[in-house]
Amino acid sequence: MSMDELDPHVARALTLAARFQSALDGTLNQMNNGSFRATDEAETVEVTINGHQWLTGLRIEDGLLKKLGAEAVAQRVNEALHNAQAAASAYNDAAGEQLTAALSAMSRAMNEGMA
């Protein structure tokens, strides 16, 4: 049976389900394979986190520990981590909104089909 032979509401729901699956796959792919990179304000420390917000990379400018000391560098690492987490959270929020919109559209299409 082709999409042309289906009830229009069923066909729409299937199309929306495929769109939702695609959006979900994209979100999961970003979480598993993506990365978010950020620096401190002075750009002396750079961190990389993955989509699960696990630290996967850290770069500290040469000589910074000696110049500023461990406490100041730790503050910069935390600042960079905060910035990377903010970027990851913004991405996750947008992805969540896309998934919610796709589910809502699917629900409306199915409800219209039952009416």
Swiss-Prot record:
GO terms for molecular function: DNA binding. The modification N-acetylserine is found at residue 2. Keywords: Acetylation. Pfam families: YbaB_DNA_bd. InterPro entries: YbaB-like_sf (IPR036894), YbaB/EbfC (IPR004401). GO terms for biological process: symbiont-mediated suppression of host innate immune response. Disruption phenotype: Grows normally in liquid culture, traffics into host (human and mouse) acidified compartments early after phagocytosis, suggesting it no longer arrests phagosome maturation as well as wild-type, impaired growth in mouse macrophages. GO terms for cellular component: peptidoglycan-based cell wall; plasma membrane. It comes from the Bacteria. Probably plays a role in host phagosome maturation arrest. This is ESX-1 secretion-associated protein EspL. It comes from Mycobacterium tuberculosis (strain ATCC 25618 / H37Rv).
